[in-house]
Amino acid sequence: MEYFDIRKMPVNLWRNGAGETREICCFPPATRDFHWRASIASIATNGEFARFPGMERVVTLLEGGEIHLESTDSFSHTLKQLQPFAFSGEQIVKAQLNEGQMSMDFNIMTRCNSCKAKVRIADRTFTTFGSRGGVVFVISGIWQLGDKVLTTDQGACWYDGKHTLRLLQSTGKLLFSEINWLPGYSPDQVQ
């Protein structure tokens, strides 16, 4: 289990200057040839997303103005807060900020031939399934994971196991991304 606070994470500027990324975790750890990766991105200006051939992306707008995403050959979609949207990393995708507002989003990328991410927003206590990787990010409220208390802009990632996330207040929201391995793959096989 790895815990994080995005306010204390290193920032990497995008090559096109349109935003910045804070990498949360990847599997296998510390490699460019990952099977899955989670990050938080701040988008400051209109521009193209980087292409990631062989990957599926799920993007969830966390804060800021809506973002219109356009792929000339495939889709036109407006990202709204806390509504995950999946698309192929192979596509050229242009991002247009609504009213020029800076936006922050959660990104999970998975290698198409080995695993898949399911992203959802939780508002009550829940337990994850065993033997799957996952990432949680606190949007609001106070949550407990094991003996650790997590608050806004904090989270955790893991590569397997069963975990209970307990909401300690009457209201709260948490982004949860579960990683499911495709048949023939498991965390033990790809490290």
From Swiss-Prot:
CDD domains, per the entry: cupin_HutD_N (cd20293)
Gene3D superfamilies to which the protein is assigned, alphabetical: Jelly Rolls (2.60.120.10)
PANTHER family: PROTEIN VES (PTHR37943:SF1)
Originating gene: ves
Name of the featured protein: Protein Ves
HAMAP family: Ves
Domain of life: Bacteria
InterPro entries assigned to the protein according to its UniProt record, in alphabetical order: RmlC-like_jellyroll (IPR014710), RmlC_Cupin_sf (IPR011051), Uncharacterised_HutD/Ves (IPR010282), Uncharacterised_Ves (IPR023482)
Cited NCBIfam families: PRK11396.1 (NF008488)
Family: Belongs to the Ves family.
